[in-house]
């Protein structure tokens, strides 16, 4: 918040563009609204950014609630998942995703997903991988940032746990291929914009 206040009050910036992270963006949202500073393309899909609508907040990333519903529908309808688990970051980002997944399951008369959380500061995910394995879930959805998401995939692979794995678009970073190792094979994730360096795409 202090850094954004400096940008607005001392550097007199016209707008804030592409601020990274749910907690960071929510932390400065009210201040930017009160000061009529345009908040463009915040890097978060939290519904709290857009609901209620704010005149100077322009969110482009897919809403985590919508994303959670779509991932659940795909897991059940396309992959034939019978029992779901969710590995999620224990903050607004992960909690919104988990709530959406469970809402879709409830709508279908199904049991809630097995919820396995991690904290943003965690660096070892062996315990979470074991919890996911012992849950008996045949499908796991990740609402995680790249390093923890890729790391838990690697840990699951180490212990021979190979469920169908889907993930929020937040995980989409080239680093996950090295971090996750061979366990990355078969990962399904969504996207809300084409790669900016794909010169074969006429939209780019």
Regions found by a protein language model. Give the residues of each.
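Beta-alpha junction/loop-to-helix N-cap segments that form part of ligand/metal-binding clefts
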Residues: 1-48, 118-125, 145-150
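Solvent-exposed polar/charged
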Residues: 9, 30-33, 77, 134, ...
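Structured helix-beta-strand junction loops
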Residues: 10, 35, 108, 135-136, ...
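Extracellular/periplasmic Venus flytrap/periplasmic-binding protein
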Residues: 46-50, 55-160, 178, 197-203
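Early exported N-terminus immediately downstream of N-terminal targeting peptides
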Residues: 192-194
